Amino acid sequence: MSSHDVVNVVRRVFNERRVGHAGTLDPQASGVLLVCVGPATRLDAYLVGHGKRYRMGVTFGLSTVTDDSEGEITKELSVPDRIAEEEFAQNYVEHMVGQGMQVPPIYSAIKVKGKKAYEQARAGKVIDLAPRPFEIYDACLSEVRDTLRLDGKTGIEWVCEMSVSKGTYMRSLARDMGRDLDCCAYVSSLARIRSGSIVLEDCVSLERLEQDKESALIDPLRALGIRFAFARECATKVEHGSSLLDEDLSLNEPLLTELYAPCTCTTSVIPSTKPPKPNELVGVIVDNRLKALYEYHESEHRYIPRCVFSIGVERGRTV
């Protein structure tokens, strides 16, 4: 199922055309997919840049046209004995941490001359994609195990977890791991287990969504992972999209609660003792709705509006 398929399900369940997702999942992958509904679709631009964490299975000895188990096999190479050694695998994965450049898979949604790369690849065209920067923040090996490869033979699979920057292609990482280890490799399983501050345990299946749509709702402040303030004396200024002074907002720490509570107006609110940072994005609450996002300009000692909602984004059930 593609990310677009998920969007279509959400549109039907909520009876709302304005639905978007923050960060495409490969059709083969499972896990966290943040979906914005109604006015919350304007938050997409602020959610897609968050780092993500994956649990990935990498199987060695074969390469495929899509760099995962969905594509046709393009090459088979013998697998060095060291790949089956857990100590070697652990050291290799841990040393992947850092910055680098990678060429995205040709079967990706990147646009080349106005058309998606995977559409051109399916049409038999030769795709030349430029390398892009990426960063692995941390990486660890969970397991080295025997597995059944796409060709029906027994192979070696590394199961690892990685936290990566926006725009990192896990299929490219697996492909390049194989090349670096003098064989070839593909992604045999992939699950996104965190997106920003939202973890897998916060999410619900599509089946659960169909039964109880409110069970999937998450406070937008938690999804954004930013500090926030209640507009008590400055609500009118926020409504009009005016700039705010330092003294207008008393910041609170980012929310750490899981799914939204029956009323989130005061749930887990911890006052912040740190002053606003230059260019920091903060949320402003009016009547228990996320009414606006403001950016702090240190030189002017004021907050500048970046996104103001006409009715605001709901944070909790009406009590």
What are these regions, as identified by a protein language model?
Residues 1-21, 25, 29, 155-157, ...:
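Accessory RNA 3′-end/elbow-binding domains used by RNA modification enzymes
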Residues 35:
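Phosphate-centric recognition/catalysis
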Residues 1-30, 39-207, 299, 311-319:
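Non-catalytic RNA-recognition surface used by pseudouridine synthases
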